[in-house]
Protein backbone atom coordinates (compact mmCIF):
# COMPACT_ATOMS: atom_id res chain seq x y z
CA UNK A 1 0.00 0.00 0.00
CA UNK A 2 1.45 3.36 -0.96
CA UNK A 3 1.33 6.52 1.13
CA UNK A 4 -1.42 8.14 -0.97
CA UNK A 5 -3.75 5.20 -0.35
CA UNK A 6 -2.97 5.20 3.36
CA UNK A 7 -3.64 8.94 3.53
CA UNK A 8 -6.99 8.59 1.74
CA UNK A 9 -8.04 5.72 3.98
CA UNK A 10 -7.44 7.93 7.02
CA UNK A 11 -9.42 10.86 5.56
CA UNK A 12 -13.16 11.09 6.05
CA UNK A 13 -15.26 11.04 2.91
CA UNK A 14 -16.30 14.60 3.76
CA UNK A 15 -12.67 15.78 3.70
CA UNK A 16 -12.10 13.89 0.45
CA UNK A 17 -15.20 15.50 -1.06
CA UNK A 18 -14.04 18.97 0.00
CA UNK A 19 -10.64 18.34 -1.57
CA UNK A 20 -12.36 17.18 -4.76
CA UNK A 21 -14.40 20.40 -4.81
CA UNK A 22 -11.21 22.44 -4.38
CA UNK A 23 -9.87 20.65 -7.46
CA UNK A 24 -13.08 21.38 -9.37
CA UNK A 25 -14.00 17.68 -9.58
CA UNK A 26 -17.75 18.02 -9.05
CA UNK A 27 -18.76 14.50 -10.08
CA UNK A 28 -16.06 12.98 -7.86
CA UNK A 29 -17.29 15.10 -4.94
CA UNK A 30 -20.88 13.93 -5.50
CA UNK A 31 -19.77 10.30 -5.51
CA UNK A 32 -17.80 10.78 -2.30
CA UNK A 33 -20.76 12.47 -0.59
CA UNK A 34 -23.03 9.54 -1.48
CA UNK A 35 -20.39 7.12 -0.18
CA UNK A 36 -20.10 9.19 2.99
CA UNK A 37 -23.85 8.82 3.60
CA UNK A 38 -23.70 5.04 3.06
CA UNK A 39 -20.72 4.69 5.41
CA UNK A 40 -22.38 6.73 8.14
CA UNK A 41 -25.66 4.81 7.83
CA UNK A 42 -23.79 1.51 8.16
CA UNK A 43 -22.11 2.67 11.38
CA UNK A 44 -25.35 4.15 12.71
CA UNK A 45 -27.29 0.96 12.03
CA UNK A 46 -24.70 -1.15 13.84
CA UNK A 47 -24.99 1.10 16.91
CA UNK A 48 -28.80 0.82 16.95
CA UNK A 49 -28.61 -2.96 16.52
CA UNK A 50 -26.29 -3.05 19.52
CA UNK A 51 -28.85 -1.23 21.68
CA UNK A 52 -31.54 -3.84 21.01
CA UNK A 53 -29.03 -6.64 21.60
CA UNK A 54 -28.03 -5.15 24.98
CA UNK A 55 -31.66 -4.64 26.02
CA UNK A 56 -32.39 -8.25 25.08
CA UNK A 57 -29.53 -9.40 27.31
CA UNK A 58 -30.91 -7.28 30.15
CA UNK A 59 -34.42 -8.66 29.68
CA UNK A 60 -33.36 -12.29 29.48
CA UNK A 61 -30.89 -12.07 32.37
CA UNK A 62 -32.65 -9.78 34.85
CA UNK A 63 -36.30 -9.69 33.73
CA UNK A 64 -38.06 -7.39 31.30
CA UNK A 65 -39.00 -4.87 34.00
CA UNK A 66 -35.31 -3.98 33.98
CA UNK A 67 -35.60 -3.11 30.29
CA UNK A 68 -38.00 -0.34 31.25
CA UNK A 69 -35.69 0.86 34.00
CA UNK A 70 -32.68 0.82 31.67
CA UNK A 71 -34.60 2.78 29.03
CA UNK A 72 -35.58 5.40 31.61
CA UNK A 73 -32.08 5.58 33.08
CA UNK A 74 -30.87 7.67 30.14
CA UNK A 75 -33.12 10.47 31.40
CA UNK A 76 -31.65 10.29 34.90
CA UNK A 77 -28.05 10.91 33.96
CA UNK A 78 -26.74 14.45 33.59
CA UNK A 79 -26.98 14.68 29.82
CA UNK A 80 -29.53 16.63 27.81
CA UNK A 81 -31.91 14.18 26.13
CA UNK A 82 -34.28 14.84 23.20
CA UNK A 83 -37.43 14.49 25.35
CA UNK A 84 -36.06 17.11 27.73
CA UNK A 85 -35.28 19.50 24.88
CA UNK A 86 -38.55 19.27 23.01
CA UNK A 87 -40.65 19.38 26.21
CA UNK A 88 -40.02 23.14 26.28
CA UNK A 89 -40.41 23.80 22.55
CA UNK A 90 -43.27 25.29 20.58
CA UNK A 91 -44.87 22.67 18.32
CA UNK A 92 -43.25 24.12 15.21
CA UNK A 93 -39.80 23.97 16.77
CA UNK A 94 -40.45 20.44 18.02
CA UNK A 95 -41.24 19.43 14.43
CA UNK A 96 -38.04 21.02 13.16
CA UNK A 97 -36.00 19.31 15.88
CA UNK A 98 -37.62 15.90 15.34
CA UNK A 99 -37.06 16.13 11.59
CA UNK A 100 -33.39 16.87 12.27
CA UNK A 101 -33.18 13.75 14.44
CA UNK A 102 -34.77 11.47 11.86
CA UNK A 103 -32.75 12.88 8.99
CA UNK A 104 -29.76 11.83 11.09
CA UNK A 105 -31.40 8.44 11.58
CA UNK A 106 -31.68 8.05 7.77
CA UNK A 107 -35.42 7.48 8.08
CA UNK A 108 -37.75 7.92 5.12
CA UNK A 109 -39.78 10.93 6.32
CA UNK A 110 -43.09 12.46 5.26
CA UNK A 111 -44.36 15.52 7.17
CA UNK A 112 -47.89 16.92 6.97
CA UNK A 113 -49.91 19.46 8.94
CA UNK A 114 -53.47 18.92 10.12
CA UNK A 115 -55.78 21.35 11.91
CA UNK A 116 -54.79 20.22 15.40
CA UNK A 117 -51.44 18.50 14.92
CA UNK A 118 -48.38 17.79 12.83
CA UNK A 119 -47.94 14.26 11.51
CA UNK A 120 -44.62 12.55 10.85
CA UNK A 121 -44.70 9.31 8.88
CA UNK A 122 -41.58 7.15 8.91
CA UNK A 123 -41.58 4.42 6.27
CA UNK A 124 -39.59 2.98 7.77
CA UNK A 125 -38.16 4.47 10.89
CA UNK A 126 -34.54 3.52 10.26
CA UNK A 127 -34.04 2.37 13.85
CA UNK A 128 -36.72 0.14 15.37
CA UNK A 129 -38.76 -0.07 12.17
CA UNK A 130 -35.79 -1.12 10.08
CA UNK A 131 -34.76 -3.81 12.56
CA UNK A 132 -38.30 -5.20 12.76
CA UNK A 133 -38.56 -5.31 8.97
CA UNK A 134 -35.30 -7.22 8.93
CA UNK A 135 -36.81 -9.75 11.33
CA UNK A 136 -34.41 -9.31 14.22
CA UNK A 137 -37.13 -10.48 16.62
CA UNK A 138 -37.36 -13.80 14.79
CA UNK A 139 -34.92 -16.74 14.59
CA UNK A 140 -31.99 -16.91 14.59
CA UNK A 141 -31.50 -13.58 16.42
CA UNK A 142 -34.71 -13.58 18.51
CA UNK A 143 -34.23 -10.09 19.92
CA UNK A 144 -36.62 -9.22 22.72
CA UNK A 145 -40.23 -8.10 22.81
CA UNK A 146 -42.21 -7.44 25.97
CA UNK A 147 -44.43 -10.17 27.35
CA UNK A 148 -46.24 -7.79 29.69
CA UNK A 149 -47.97 -4.44 29.23
CA UNK A 150 -46.63 -1.36 31.04
CA UNK A 151 -46.91 2.44 30.85
CA UNK A 152 -43.49 2.34 29.16
CA UNK A 153 -44.97 0.13 26.39
CA UNK A 154 -48.12 2.25 25.89
CA UNK A 155 -50.05 -0.38 27.84
CA UNK A 156 -49.41 -2.94 25.10
CA UNK A 157 -47.72 -6.32 25.00
CA UNK A 158 -45.25 -7.48 22.35
CA UNK A 159 -43.42 -4.16 21.96
CA UNK A 160 -39.82 -4.51 20.85
CA UNK A 161 -37.35 -3.73 23.60
CA UNK A 162 -35.76 -1.15 21.32
CA UNK A 163 -39.02 0.74 20.66
CA UNK A 164 -39.69 1.02 24.41
CA UNK A 165 -37.62 4.21 24.46
CA UNK A 166 -40.27 5.96 22.34
CA UNK A 167 -42.92 5.39 25.02
CA UNK A 168 -40.38 6.53 27.62
CA UNK A 169 -39.89 9.72 25.59
CA UNK A 170 -43.62 10.42 25.92
CA UNK A 171 -43.51 9.89 29.68
CA UNK A 172 -40.35 11.91 30.16
CA UNK A 173 -41.48 14.89 28.08
CA UNK A 174 -44.36 15.34 30.55
CA UNK A 175 -42.15 14.74 33.57
CA UNK A 176 -39.77 17.38 32.21
CA UNK A 177 -42.56 19.94 32.15
CA UNK A 178 -44.62 19.54 28.97
CA UNK A 179 -48.43 19.59 29.52
CA UNK A 180 -48.82 16.64 27.14
CA UNK A 181 -46.44 14.24 25.39
CA UNK A 182 -44.64 16.43 22.88
CA UNK A 183 -44.46 13.55 20.40
CA UNK A 184 -47.02 10.75 20.45
CA UNK A 185 -46.06 7.49 18.79
CA UNK A 186 -48.27 5.01 16.96
CA UNK A 187 -45.97 2.05 16.42
CA UNK A 188 -47.49 -0.35 13.88
CA UNK A 189 -48.42 -3.94 14.67
CA UNK A 190 -47.24 -4.89 11.18
CA UNK A 191 -43.58 -3.88 10.71
CA UNK A 192 -44.23 -3.27 7.01
CA UNK A 193 -46.55 -0.41 7.93
CA UNK A 194 -45.07 3.03 8.68
CA UNK A 195 -44.50 4.40 12.17
CA UNK A 196 -46.74 7.44 12.71
CA UNK A 197 -45.89 10.20 15.17
CA UNK A 198 -48.06 13.15 16.20
CA UNK A 199 -47.12 16.55 17.56
CA UNK A 200 -50.28 18.24 18.85
CA UNK A 201 -50.54 22.02 18.80
CA UNK A 202 -52.73 22.33 21.92
CA UNK A 203 -53.09 20.13 24.99
CA UNK A 204 -56.89 20.30 24.82
CA UNK A 205 -56.87 18.56 21.44
CA UNK A 206 -54.88 15.55 22.63
CA UNK A 207 -57.20 12.53 23.09
CA UNK A 208 -57.35 11.33 26.69
CA UNK A 209 -56.33 7.81 25.65
CA UNK A 210 -52.82 9.07 24.87
CA UNK A 211 -52.39 10.07 28.52
CA UNK A 212 -53.94 6.92 29.99
CA UNK A 213 -51.76 4.52 28.06
CA UNK A 214 -48.59 5.98 29.61
CA UNK A 215 -50.06 6.22 33.10
CA UNK A 216 -50.69 9.98 33.04
CA UNK A 217 -53.76 12.15 33.54
CA UNK A 218 -54.82 14.76 31.04
CA UNK A 219 -54.52 18.19 32.66
CA UNK A 220 -57.47 20.53 32.73
CA UNK A 221 -57.05 23.34 30.23
Identify what each model region corresponds to.
Residues 1-195, 201-221:
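N-terminal accessory segment detector
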Amino acid sequence: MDQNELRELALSKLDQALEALDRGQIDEAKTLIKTMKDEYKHSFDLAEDYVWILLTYIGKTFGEEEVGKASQFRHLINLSQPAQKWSKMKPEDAVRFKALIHRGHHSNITLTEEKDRYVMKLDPCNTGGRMLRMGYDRPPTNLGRTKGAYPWTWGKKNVSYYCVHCAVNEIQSMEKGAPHPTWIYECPENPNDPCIQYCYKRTGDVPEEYFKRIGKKKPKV
